Amino acid sequence: MPLAEGSTFAGFTIVRQLGSGGMGEVYLARHPRLPRQDALKVLRADVSADGEYRARFNREADAAASLWHPHIVAVHDRGEFDGQLWIDMDFVDGTDTVSLLRDRYPNGMPGPEVTEIITAVAEALDYAHERRLLHRDVKPANILIANPDSPDRRIMLADFGIAGWVDDPSGLTATNMTVGTVSYAAPEQLMGNELDGRADQYALAATAFHLLTGSPPFQHANPAVVISQHLSASPPAIGDRVPELTPLDPVFAKALAKQPKDRYQRCVDFARALGHRLGGAGDPDDTRVSQPVAVAAPAKRSLLRTAVIVPAVLAMLLVMAVAVAVREFQRADDERAAQPARTRTTTSAGTTTSVAPASTTRPAPTTPTTTGAADTATASPTAAVVAIGALCFPLGSTGTTKTGATAYCSTLQGTNTTIWSLTEDTVASPTVTATADPTEAPLPIEQESPIRVCMQQTGQTRRECREEIRRSNGWP
């Protein structure tokens, strides 16, 4: 239950609630001894009772408290009161970049303003990296701006709440993995691999992409699709979203590279390249190679860690994906049923499914359906309805096809792409041949191969497979 205004908690007097989330609430509170107001984050009792999380929370709060930088929200104290962990931080009286986008720049912020914000955050991140600390959750919601309409406004990076040491084997877990994080997380972070400062650089680049265009690089109502795109899809060209930003295409191609070694070594290198191409203050030689931030060699990857973290994180996301998949196939069945009646017209209202911070609008099913857990029950008590050849995540998960057959999330041979298949483990390259529709432009191999897998395994036509995969993946 949220704390009431005027009540006391650990000596702090609650002024008002600032926000809430899955792990707890944040309050504006008066300090018990000093004449100031702070931001007090209070975790839920059930989260606080988790022994492993408690130890990690204390360790990471201590790590965040060691940072002292003009662009980092300071951590002052931590503790426990009535079975709930809490952390005391600076209160930033202002806004965040999510609010700026929503209220002022729904189609993207001006280049010079983005350069200023990204440069400030990049300096803060490199400062932390030099001290062997990673943020792990860089996104627009964590970039705060104090006095946003003043010439002396301050740009600050908040919530080192899942910060950790470079060689810390914890960090990304189901407890702190959110849909918002998925939109900006680096491939190696999503896979539970070793991390260094280049994971934060990837997230910073995804954040810059969002600030400039009004939406993140990869967006889909199904978070499992977003994850698959981070892992296997080519970085989107920002010029395709905003033509006047075409000069930034090579900058984002490098910053959003799948392999850390192909990215900028430091966050400020990315910020300089961005500023130079936008015509602001930046590095005139944005191709030069800088020395990477010096950190201790990370610990060897733990197979147990990967085996536990990745399924735990993405099982949560798969639950959210179930409802989307069910609605898509219900809509597909209705469309097929309507095709023989050429004069029949169906009108339905639009529904919006949000993946923070962007949204995707889709037609509603023509047959009334319920949402949430009820959608899951519509397909099967334990599995989602899936399309053979469609993107899936996590590897090894199972689903049910529209015919009732069991489908497996498997790797397509010779790629890092995971698709639904009637066979387990690796999906062999399809041997079936298909004549392309003469009215259709040739598809890239990463889209063509899954279609042929579908044809080979289900016996459906190329058009049927293409349409089912297109709907499931959200392709145009």
UniProtKB/Swiss-Prot annotation:
Binding sites annotated in the UniProt record for ATP: L18, G19, S20, G21, G22, M23, G24, E25, V26, K41
Keywords per UniProt: ATP-binding, Cell membrane, Kinase, Membrane, Nucleotide-binding, Phosphoprotein, Serine/threonine-protein kinase, Transferase, Transmembrane, Transmembrane helix
Protein kinase domain span: 12-279
BP GO annotations: negative regulation of lipid biosynthetic process; regulation of cell growth; regulation of D-glucose transmembrane transport; septin ring assembly
Source superkingdom: Bacteria
Name of a matching Pfam family: Pkinase
Topology with respect to the bilayer: Single-pass membrane protein
Residue ranges, compositional bias (Low complexity): 338-376
Loss of function: phenotype: Disruption does not attenuate growth in macrophages.
Modification note: Autophosphorylated. Dephosphorylated by PstP.
Modified residues (Phosphoserine): S290
InterPro entries for the chain: Kinase-like_dom_sf, Prot_kinase_dom, Ser/Thr_kinase_AS
SMART domains in the cross-refs: S_TKc
Catalytically driven reaction(s): L-seryl-[protein] + ATP = O-phospho-L-seryl-[protein] + ADP + H(+); L-threonyl-[protein] + ATP = O-phospho-L-threonyl-[protein] + ADP + H(+)
Entry annotated with the keyword Repressor: no
Subcellular localization, as worded in the UniProt entry: Cell membrane
UniProt EC number: 2.7.11.1
Any one GO CC term of the record: plasma membrane
Top enzyme class: transferase
Transmembrane region(s): 306-326
Gene3D superfamilies, per database record: Phosphorylase Kinase, domain 1, Transferase(Phosphotransferase) domain 1
Molecular function terms from GO: ATP binding; protein kinase activity; protein serine kinase activity; protein serine/threonine kinase activity
Role of this protein: Phosphorylates the FHA domains of the ABC transporter Rv1747, the heat-shock protein GroEL 1, and Rv0020c. May play a role in the regulation of glucose transport, cell growth and septum formation.
Family membership: Belongs to the protein kinase superfamily. Ser/Thr protein kinase family.
Complex and partners: Interacts with Rv1747.
Name this protein carries in UniProt: Serine/threonine-protein kinase PknF
Provenance organism: Mycobacterium tuberculosis (strain ATCC 25618 / H37Rv)
